[in-house]
A protein has these predicted regions:
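A short, surface-exposed loop/turn module that caps and links secondary-structure elements
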Residues: 31-56
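Enriched for short, Lys/Arg-rich terminal
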Residues: 2-13, 17, 21-24, 39, ...
């Protein structure tokens, strides 16, 4: 059963700034990867420990966390997480 996807305000703002091509890619990743197998992303360390990321392009990533108990994935960011 797929996980529910919830997008934070910040992630929505990030997605709105992306090109149409990257927005389609975000949608495909959310539906086909993250909702189905959320732990396939890269585990993050440091300030973002406990979160995961999936690459959009060379610079940008989707950053998300998983609530296993509720079967919900929270999309936190959809841009770089490297401080740019």
């Amino acid at each position: 059963m797929p996980y529910e996807i919830r997008i934070t305000r910040q992630a929505r703002k990030d997605i709105d700034t992306l090109s149409p091509k990257l927005r389609r890619k975000v949608h495909d990743i959310l539906v086909n990867l993250i909702a189905e197998v959320p732990h396939e992303g890269k585990r993050l360390l440091g300030d973002l420990a406990g979160s995961y990321s999936v690459r959009l392009n060379l610079k940008d990533r989707i950053v998300y966390s998983v609530d296993e108990k509720r079967k919900v994935v929270y999309i936190e960011r959809a841009r770089t997480h490297y401080g740019d």
